């Protein structure tokens, strides 16, 4: 018998995932060209040729080294990910944004969902609050519930779908632990304006001073 927590989670299984599965079944029945899938934000374009070529090169190099090379490709690695990969990402970020990251500032995870769950496990206590901007990716609610925390929803401006910043300020409490910013947004595709982001930062600083707490700001950027 599975736990009551999992039973409850299964009863409220992701509508987005259900739509995706239904879409796959309909595509098999009626043809891919006749079904338009607006569920998961799945990539609709192939991987760049340069990426495919780089993967082939890695596999060819591994084959040339024999068993040792093969183990280097599919064996265990450091928990944070390959250091040379993290360093390359850090250098790219530094070049683009004028930051000073090193490999030690980065941790690689298997997808953003895994990353968010790890972070939530690290920072959340029961009844802590995580703020999201509506409309939002529905799985955020379950990620918080995994650690007995609560999602607090900030409403949008229905004309622009930018966050209602007055509502944000009203929703922050002493139990607020984190805010998730997802831009371009899933599901609307809206990109939050630079001035919106600046105002969000100012509100967070104001509320941190008011409550004497620290908030974590998560930027979820799959798109």
Say what each PLM segment does.
Residues 2-111:
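N-terminal small-domain helix-loop-helix segment of the aminotransferase-like
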Residues 34, 213-214:
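A short pocket-lining beta-strand/turn micro-motif at the edge of beta-sheets
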Residues 61-212, 218:
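Conserved core of the PLP fold type I
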Residues 221:
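Walker B catalytic acidic pair
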